Structure formats: structure tokens, C-alpha cells
Amino acid sequence: MSVCTLSVPVSSISPGRRCSTFGDAGILGCVSINSNTDEDDVVEGKMVAEGANKETKLPAKKKRKKGLRIKGKRRRKKLILAKKFSKDLGSGRPVADAPASLASGAPEQDEESLFEGNIEKQIYLPSTRAKTSIVWHFFHVDPQYTWRAICNLCEKSVSRGKPGSHLGTSTLQRHLQARHSPHWTRANKFGVTNGEEDFTLDLSLSPPSPGSNGSFEYIPTDSVDENRMGKKRDKSASDALRAKRGRFLIKSNIVKHALIPGTRAKTSAVWNFFYTDPQHISRAVCNICKRSVSRGRPGSHLGTSTLQRHLQATHPIHWAVANKDSGAIGNGLDETETESSDLLNDTMPGEKSSGSQDLTAEDLSDSDTDEPPCLEVENRSESPIPVADQDNPVHAQERETTTHCENAAANQISQAVIQMIVEDLHPYNYFSTPAFQRFLQIVAPDYRLPSETYFFTKAVPQLYDSVREKIFLTLENVQSQKIHLTADIWTHDPSTDYFIVTVHWVSLETASSPSNGGTPNFRKWAVLCVTGLAKDCLITNILQELNDQIGLWLSPNFLTPSFIVSDNSSNVVHAIKGGGFTHVPCFLHCLNIVIQDFFCEHKSIENMLVAARKTCHHFSHSVKARQILQEFQNDHQLPWKNLKQDETGHWISTFYMLKWLLEHCYSVHHSLGRASGVVLTSLQWTLMTYVCDILKPFEEATQRVSVKTTGLNQVLPLIHHLLFSLQRLREDFQVRGITQALNLVDSLSLKLESDALLSAMLKSKHCILATLLDPCFKNSLEDFFPQGADLETYKQILAEEVCNYMESSPGACQISSSETSGPLVRLGTDSFTSIKEGTSSAGSLDSSAAGSVAVGSKSSLLPAAVAVVDEYFKEKYSELSGGDDPLVYWQRKVSIWPALTQVAIQYLSCPMCSWQSECMFTTNSHFHPKQIMNMDFDNIEQLIFLKMNLENVNYDYSTLILSWDPENKAVQSNEKEILP
């Protein structure tokens, strides 16, 4: 059956002026104007209005038909119109003339009185279910399976229900929310209704007014006169969108939320504090704290339980006041899905979305009368609007201040807990112990500690991602294209080794000056990865992991590794060399190998170390022995220091153990007399003294290397200093006539000079150039250079490095050439000057002097590079002492020698060792092997990464805003923080 749209005003005209069916029954019926049915046709109609004359009584058998009311969900009841209805319209007349006959029988009256209420309602035609839901703008019925609908966007077929049962639109709506959220949000915002009018009748329903006669009038909208309807359209032009939606008032004059057909009725009181997130339909934003709270997974059931728990936990005062004022305590349960009128308002930026915006009476009614509406809504769960801040504004401000203080205190406690986990590596279950819970109850009774699962799965990973992002953003701003890496493997697990990669660079612009006014720190470093590898991992696995980290961190920022520093692990060394990288041995590991070999070579030293370890073990494991030792120290007024334990494989811990025994030798000797089986002979005490004296320079060198301002420029001077110190000790022992000590000194000196790794470092190009570029040592280079090394040759190599940089950076080439044009004419007659003169006259260097120098543009740049290097060596330097960072000097030369400065930064920024991981994996750190075994493997990698980076990154924990909502969500602030 075809359909049409009729606009029907309510009138109080007497029944005689209308057809008898309307006068007797008071029931509105309609027949399509395009229908040619005869009087035997039975027509079905859907009604949503009351008859105008409620006093008229129906026959007994039809009394139940009197009037229709909306109860609960809106129900469209079908009424079968009797054949008498067709006869009263006039037998033999076309059905299309029926409305005209009705209109002719009505008295003439003002047209505006017929639309006084201007509140529209929909009446549906027979045998047609109106597609009032806006989801049908995105779907069409599947022609093959009528119980399914096909999405117009993705062409996916979605079920509407079981065949033969009720077919709804809830599944279609959830599909749009999950798969096409932007389209669905936009449709809700602008209230799309085009294409639905063919299924509806517009029934204007208003309360009786003195100017209205209460008559019914049928006007088919297909043939309506535009001039006749012009006044009404002009009147409602400003509210065109709202006029297309059904509006009504509750009889108690409390504004009811206008609901979108097919959407969830927001009857819960929590929506007075939330609005739907426009970007994420499955989340809601709190109006008080502006936090986004999840309502459920996208595409699944979206409830309000989490929103209510958020209010109870974070804003208990507002929630309690709202419940008290509205009497709606417990109204925060999940809403039931309903179908209602299709009404939605546009929202301005900054306002709540349509799903949570309350409509006022002025928005819903354009009537000039003050009489209550005649439309009654019964048995519907009304949701009065609780207002949280209707009381005194001063009290409301005090409550907001109190809530803000409570939230700030809770955030500080939460940040402190995460800081303890990361920096001290406390196990997660430590905070769940009853003792800590009692402590927390005393300190912060209102604070609720999240579960350990939250820290493990959300807090630590989010902090981990934040720190990684900061490091990556910092690497984007690195000026030099060449940086350096350190690669180490540390063992603290029976089956797993930890592979650590650290990046090092120099930033002359962002140097942070210490508070005490010392030397600024230009050297920056960050740990890139902490990866667990199996004990039996191959060289290819290490190389693959190294290449992965380079591709992840360096390649996107156009950075290349210049040198890679590592220990003497054969797998790591072979992996670095196999990947084509330049390997630099770790200086501390080289010293450790030399001293460990020195211990093993002398049997007397080994026996002395065994007795010393037993002595320390006796005092560390016996409480009574420590008490006796401390009492003896106190009785003789001797200073007491904590016992130092020896760590296998590290000579520095052995040195500190021997030093502690010598400092407490008098007390230890008397205390050991009472203990059986632990004896240190006088010869061993004497040998211990010799060993400590010999190792003292090595301990000083180790402390020197551990300083953050040291680089490859210290390798040659430190080796020279060690050899010189051993020579002075030999002379002292020779004067004193101590043969045993002389033999020990000679043995260690020989090992230091003949060690393969140290010898390779002494002759390596990068160590020599780094020493040349340190202004502290440029005037005494002959003392540091190994035998057979020519200073002029390395000056030439340095000039070639500067020339290469000029060729790759034309800007630096122009500055250097213009500023060094003068010195080319005023060159001396030394060997290095002759190279420059030969280059200037012939355009290229002699093959014996510069075999690797290219011709062409490079040959034209070489004279300028040679001039810059010669000017650097001729400059007198007395501003800084040998203990200061040479980068301070080069910071002042950036504008004078830009190319030479960049080459100097490249060599001076390379570290001598990986002291960062050395400090992490030692007995003095908080890193305990037992703790690793009890933790998750992947998470312990993140904890080590954070512990090593947080202090260096200077992360501000106050920027980590943690909200313990029911889903334990943590929100990291969007501010991007850059490394200092």
C-alpha cells in the first residue's frame, strides 16, 4: 500500500460537522489518497494521539479503544477501520476526495490557529513500519535475506535479528559506532533525516486554546499549497532541525531528554556530569575533571557503571549532592535500550555533546499558552536533572578546592609509588603487603592503591613509552651526523644475558651548567635497548639486534654510528666487526684483564687473596664476630667503616677489600685470634700492603675514567700516567731495597706495555686524533705518542678529516676558507708547512704524504684544512687545566673553525668505556639477581631501561597524571619534554 503525509490540527468542532465515525469514536483514521480500494478493503492504521472529545463514550465492546497513551516504550497500536468509515466518506466517490470533503465541511478560520501548538507528532500509515532511525541512512535491507541489512559504507551484511522475530536496529547502530564512528558522529550532530518523510504523517497536536475550534482537518502534503503553508514555515525557520524531531514535555514540567531513535536512552543521572567523547564514541568526558572514562569496548555494550564509579571515587561530594537533590540514588545503573523520538540538538564548541545536553522548556515548545501539554507519558523512568552546584557558590568553590587538593595528593602518592618501583626496583607485590597497607592507611587514609597488575601492565609500560619518545625526539635534534654506541652483555640470570646498547653524542647548545658553578656537561647519552638474549646466542643474533636498534633509533634521524665501544666478549666483538663497524675496546675491561692476569701470575698473591676473602666472609656472616670487632674499635677509638665485599671478576672490588683490611688490620688481627681456621700471616699482611700501593694508580685511573667528561682523548695520557707511576714506585722500592715489591712492579709494568688490546689502542688512529684534538695535551704530544709514531703524519691525517667534512658541508667550507685565507701566506718552513705549500702550488699532495687524498674538489679544499690545523697547533693554550672538558674550548671555536670543531666533537665525544652499565650491574647498585628471576622477563627489561635513563633524562614525575578510575587508566600529559 502506498503512503502519504497529512498534517492534522486538533479542533473542538461538533461531531455533526464531521463524519460520524470521528464524532462517535473520537479516533483518527486515514486512507492513502493513492489507493483505489473499494469498501471491502480493510485498512490498518497506527495511532499516537487522543481523540479531541474525551467525554464521548464508546460502545461497551469498543470502550477499550478510547484514547491511546504512551506507556514505557513507544508502542504503535494497529486499529482496523470498519467498512462504515469508507461509506461515511461517500460511496462511489474517489477516495482522493475524502480529505477535500472534510475540509469543505469545516468553518473558515484563521490558519495559524490550526498550528498554534506547533508541536509535531508522527502517525504511520497502514502496513508500513516507519524507518525512523537514522541508521537507515547508512543501511539498506538485504534483498536476499530480509532479516539482514547491508552497510552502504563497507558493504557488510549485518543481522537485525532472528528470522520471524522482532527485527531491530541495535546491531546496526553498534556496527556504525565500531566501524564508522566519524560518519555516525557527524550524522548525530547534524540530525540527518532526509529520505524518511515518505513514511510519516505530520500530526500537529496542541492543547485547546480559546481561539481554536477543535476540528480535525486533513491536508495531503503531496498537493499542499506552498502559499498556504508559508506562514508556518517562516515561523519555524530558525528551528528547522528541531521541528523535524518529535518534542514533548512531561506533565510535571521537568524537561525530559529527547532521544534519538534506535539509540540508548540516557536516563541515568551520571549524564549530568558526563558527555560523550566526540572522538571516541565508547568514552565519556567528565565535566568536572575533564578526564576521559571508558564506557566499554567499541562495538560492545556501552554502560554507565564505570562513569558512576568514577563519580563515587573522584567526585563523591558532587555525586552525593546530586543524588540527594534529585532523589535518584542508585540511578547510575546501565540504561535500558529504548526507541524514542528522533531528536538531536547541535552543540557549539565547548558545550556538551547532544547525548548529554539537557533541553529547556523554551527549546521544546513554541506555544504561547501556559497550559500544560495534553500528551501524557506514563510508566517511563523519568530522570530528573540533578544539579551539583545549585547551593551557595562559596560552598561549591570550597568543595572544588577540597577535591582538587585530594586529587593532587593522590597523584603525588601514585607518582611516588611508581618512582620507588622504577628507581629502587621494588617488586610489585611489595606494595600489597599488609605492613605497607597499614602504613598507607595512616599516611593517606583516603588513598586507594591500585593492584600490582595495574603497575605491571599499564603504569610502567606507559612510562616506558614516554621516556622512549623523549629520547627519540632528542635524537632528532642532534647536530652531528655521527654518534657513538656502547654495546655490553651482562649476566645476572642462569639462562639469560642482557644486551645493552647506549648512544653517546655532544650538544654544545643545550649544555646544562651544574649548580655549583663547575664545568657544563656537553656530553649526552641514553640507553636505547635492554634486550634479553639466550646464553647460547650466536653472533648473528647479536648483529641482528644491533642493526635493529640502529634502524629504529638512528636511521630515521639520519645518524650513523662512528665507533662502537664494547668489552672483550668474543661474540660482541665479532658481531661489531662483522657488521662493518669500527670497534673500540673498553678501557676499564683492558685494565681488568691486565690486573687479573697479574694476580694469577703470582702464587703468593693468590694465597693472600684467599685468606683475605675468608676473613671478610667470617665478619660478614657472623654477627658475634662483627660485634667483637666493633667493640674493639670503640675501645681503642679507631674509626669504623663498612665492610667491603669482593666481587668475582672485578679487580676494583678486590682492591677495596684489601684496603678495608689494612685500615682495620689491628682490630682484625686481635679479633681473628678467637676464631679458628681464619688466619692472616704477617707475610700476607705485608704483601697486602705492597699490592695496594701498586694498584693505587690504577684505582685513580679508574675513577678518572668514570667521570662523565672523559673520552678517547684520555687513553694515551692515562696509559702514560700508569707507566710513569709504576716507574716511580719501582724507584722507591729500589731505594728501600724491597725485592719482592720490585718484582711485582716489573711484572705489572711488562703486562701493561705488552697487552695486546692496550697496545692496539695506543697505536689506533682514533685515539691518537682524539689526543691531538685535546688542547690540554697538544703541547706535550711527544710524551704520549708510542714509539715509532710520527706527529706530522697524524697532523696530515687530521687535515684530511677536516677536508672530508668541508667537502660534505659546503657551508663550513666557505667559512673556513674565508677566515683562513691569511694564514696560508704566513706559513712557516716546518715539515707540515711544506705539505701545505706543495698542495697550494701543485694542487695535490705527494703520494707518500697523503696517499688517500682525493683529487678534484677535495684537493682544492685541502690547503684550507691544512691551514686550519696548523693554526690550531700554533695557538697558545693556557686557559684550561688538564682536568677540564676540552669541549669547553671547542664551544668557543665553533664560529672560528667550524669544520675542525665538528671533527673534534666526533672524536672527543666517544667514551672510553661503558661506565653506565658498569655502575648498573655491580654489587653497589640496587639490582639484585633474585629479584629478576621473580619478575616478568619483558617487564624487567623495561624497568632496567627506565632505571638507567630516568636520571639522565631528568624526567619530571609530576607530568605523569595518574587517575585510578575503575579501569585503572593512566593518562600521560601531552607536553613534550626535551632532554636538557
Swiss-Prot record:
Expressed in pancreatic islet cells and weakly expressed in surrounding exocrine tissues (at protein level). Expressed in muscle and brain (at protein level). Shows broad tissue distribution with expression detected in brain, stomach, intestine, heart, kidney, liver, lung, skeletal muscle, ovary, spleen, tail and testis. A zinc finger (BED-type) spans 130-187, 265-322. The modification Phosphoserine is found at S383. Zn(2+) 1 binds at C151, C154, H175, H180. Residues 360-373 have a biased composition (Acidic residues). It comes from the Eukaryota. One of its GO terms (molecular function) is protein dimerization activity. Transcriptional repressor which binds to the consensus sequence 5'-GCTCGC-3', transcription regulation may be tissue-specific. Regulates the expression of target genes such as: IGF2, PGAP6/TMEM8, ENHO, and PIANP. Acts as a transcriptional repressor of growth factor IGF2, thereby negatively regulating postnatal growth of muscles and internal organs, especially in females. Negatively regulates myoblast differentiation and myoblast mitochondrial activity via its regulation of IGF2 transcription. This is Zinc finger BED domain-containing protein 6. It comes from Mus musculus. The lineage of its organism: Eukaryota, Metazoa, Chordata, Craniata, Vertebrata. The gene is Zbed6.
